[in-house]
Amino acid sequence: MSGSTVPAGAVVPEAHTIETFQPPREMLQNHPSKPHLANFEEYQKLYKQSITEPNVFWAERARELLSWSKDFQTVHSGSLANGDNAWFVEGELNASYNCVDRHAHKDPNRVAIIYEADEPGQGRNVTYGELLREVSKLAHVLTNLGVRKGDTVAIYLPMIPEAIVAMLACTRIGAIHSVVFAGFSSDSLRDRVVDAQSKVVITTDEGKRGGKLIGTKKIVDEALQQCPDVRNVLVYKRTGADISMTPGRDLWWHEEVEKYPAYYTPVAMASEDPLFLLYTSGSTGKPKGVAHSTGGYLLGAAMTGKYVFDIHDGDRYFCGGDVGWITGHTYVLYAPLLLGVSTVVFEGTPAYPNFSRYWDIIEEHKVTQFYVAPTALRLLKRAGDHHVRNEMKHLRVLGSVGEPIAAEVWKWYYDVVGKGRAQICDTYWQTETGSNVITPLAGVTPTKPGSASFPFFGIEPALVDPVTGEEIHGNDVEGVLAFKQPWPSMARTVWGAHKRYMETYLHVYKGYYFTGDGAARDHEGFYWIRGRVDDVVNVSGHRLSTAEIEAALIEHHSIAEAAVVGVADELTGQAVNAFVAVKEGTQINDALRKEFVLQVRRSIGPFAAPKAIYIVPDLPKTRSGKIMRRILRKIVAGEEDQLGDITTLSDPSVVAKIIDVVHAQRQ
């Protein structure tokens, strides 16, 4: 324990009462070798070097973890203030060579991809040797379709091995992959194809997810009605559905790859050449195509895979993220394959055909690292512990990604899923950071439930006063989270809009990278992420983090999920409105709502008490699991006609149900 009395004015009160967990003894005892660092002191020493001598630190790591066809001399040039950062400047390398060839040459029969299809038992394994052949053949196809170095290719594929093959085939020929999540609407797809100027789109006849069919090709056809510059659509046959094929434009993947040899010489890329574009949410305004470089991004992926997740030879890594998001890019594809281990590609959902699906996959494939969003964990915790019937004794690391994980969900993950044998790594990062930036290192870092713990190598956090723009020093402080130094895997620009990149990330506080998130540093130096700066409610001069109020609400035994938004209030400036989904079998009445308000009063204080609590069947979420608080804000503000594109939600029908609840309660 960190001590059970909370000093007056403590910025992170929970840090004083919550238990600090050391890396589990059983994890270290049963380790196939040992963690890459001896102890926390070694992390501190290396971390210090990464901040004071970044060029020495990163040059050594880049040469150790990546294979360069041409060495670099200049480790880093540019600055945050100027937005012209470049790493390993003269170096040349190829991403697909680093992810595939070098492992295939050593051991072609080593499994690269463990494909777990939507229907259990229908998956297959792909070895590094097979992956090299498949990537090479598709590289020939793309070249034959006129795709050249520096061109973008749009990939609209579900979670199947071909998504990995397509991404790597692009990198092999020097093309830039632009993956669009295969759940986005045709309008969202169109916007991304147009913005990236992609001439080729890769998709499937259909997708399968959670027992349902998704008409991916149909969506592509709709999107392309307004994309005259697209020359070809390459279609992978996933279900064999009867689909329309446009002659001269549409081609079958299986027919095209048969025409070409099983090897394609990888194209040498400059370290700073763009590797991929990934569009961050276009739910407000035009989507931003975040552009990542080749050398720096690959190093960030390999470094965090090695040190955060303790990846060792022979591991089997399972990230539940989708390649349509940054989590799937970095931790389904790049980190595991750069390190030459097996990565699980899971097509389905955690609830299909039942709530044991994740645990069955982990058990069957002897998974060593598992990485998933708190949304999925809340769903599975809500479903009941009896679903977690597997031993899963090979698990060493349990990662969490996408949003802060509430303490009780953290403990459930640790006790029920990990059985106290696996370390929890609550990782903080963003599409723009490329890889984990504040995170524990498995087997090394002490952890506190709810805290992302300490910065990764090369990341120098600063908490900035949002009013003065000055850095706030010392511990037991909070502010806006920014970074003081560039790091290799940071995004280099917004595609075709460098000014927007500068204004969004680098000019908010000159000389800093601005994350847009609030954070606190507790009395022991642990970092606590407090949610988006715009997810702050100001009630009677009290700045309240919505994440904090949500965490207080879900401490109540009846609440499965909660989302909090601020709504304009004549008296207090803003008032707290809460939307909660309750566990099955809960009796809904006014007494229960009062209990929920009391829960927040007790946990945070009377000023944080929600003015209204809406009990809803579910919350509006994107398919990556993020709660769309923007939609809830519009509903409570009576702006239901300005909700924007809700087709990107995992279940758009939930919006009408929420509106009904709000109307009924206000009458």
UniProtKB/Swiss-Prot annotation:
InterPro entries given in the database record: Ac_CoA_lig (IPR011904), ACAS_N (IPR032387), AMP-bd_C (IPR025110), AMP-bd_C_sf (IPR045851), AMP-binding_CS (IPR020845), AMP-dep_synth/lig_dom (IPR000873), ANL_N_sf (IPR042099)
Top-level EC class: ligase
PROSITE patterns: AMP_BINDING
Pfam family, one: AMP-binding
Highest taxon of the lineage: Eukaryota
Induction per the UniProt record: By acetate.
The EC number(s) this enzyme carries: 6.2.1.1
Annotated GO CC locations: cytosol; nucleus
GO MF assignments: acetate-CoA ligase activity; AMP binding; ATP binding
Record GO biological process: acetyl-CoA biosynthetic process; acetyl-CoA biosynthetic process from acetate
Residue positions binding CoA: 209-212, 327, 540, 601
Catalysis performed (reactions): acetate + ATP + CoA = acetyl-CoA + AMP + diphosphate
Residues that, per the record, bind ATP: 402-404, 426-431, 517, 532, 543
Keywords from the named record: ATP-binding, Ligase, Nucleotide-binding
Family of the protein in this entry: Belongs to the ATP-dependent AMP-binding enzyme family.
Name this polypeptide is given: Acetyl-coenzyme A synthetase
Organism: Neurospora crassa (strain ATCC 24698 / 74-OR23-1A / CBS 708.71 / DSM 1257 / FGSC 987)
Protein's gene: acu-5
